[in-house]
Amino acid sequence: MKLHELKPAEGSRKVRNRVGRGTSSGNGKTSGRGQKGQKARSGVGLRPGFEGGQTPLFRRLPKRGFTNINAKEYTLVNLEQLNVFEDGTEVTPVVLKEAGIIRAEKSGVKVLGNGELTKKLTVKAAKFSKSAEAAITAKGGSIEVI
């Protein structure tokens, strides 16, 4: 390969479309804005959801639900992520954070049953799914709700 044989990657050098530069360019005269109207004028700034003065959809529909300020948000950990630990390890939220499996604890850690557990572990967490609980005890490990 020589310097003069180098070519840019396909599609990486797309030419900017210059509008309003003659009719034969394909984007002359109206510059791709169509004919007259609000959107053809300069400085147009229609906010998202604006329907030309008609009551917009988000105001025609009723409000629903609420945000529960007391809802607990758990950090989720799957069984397959626990395989990084040695047999007989006591897995706590602090240990999970040190191992880089979780970033922050939030309201606690919830262990879910996705994946397959191959080690015998003692897992301490705020919550366990039924499948995770069954998988941990099936491998001879134990769970503890903290």
Swiss-Prot record:
InterPro entries: Ribosomal_uL15, Ribosomal_uL15/eL18, Ribosomal_uL15/eL18_sf, Ribosomal_uL15_bac-type, Ribosomal_uL15_CS. One of its GO terms (molecular function) is structural constituent of ribosome. Residues 1-57 are annotated as: Disordered. Pfam families: Ribosomal_L27A. One of its GO terms (biological process) is translation. The keyword rRNA-binding applies. This is Large ribosomal subunit protein uL15. The gene is rplO.
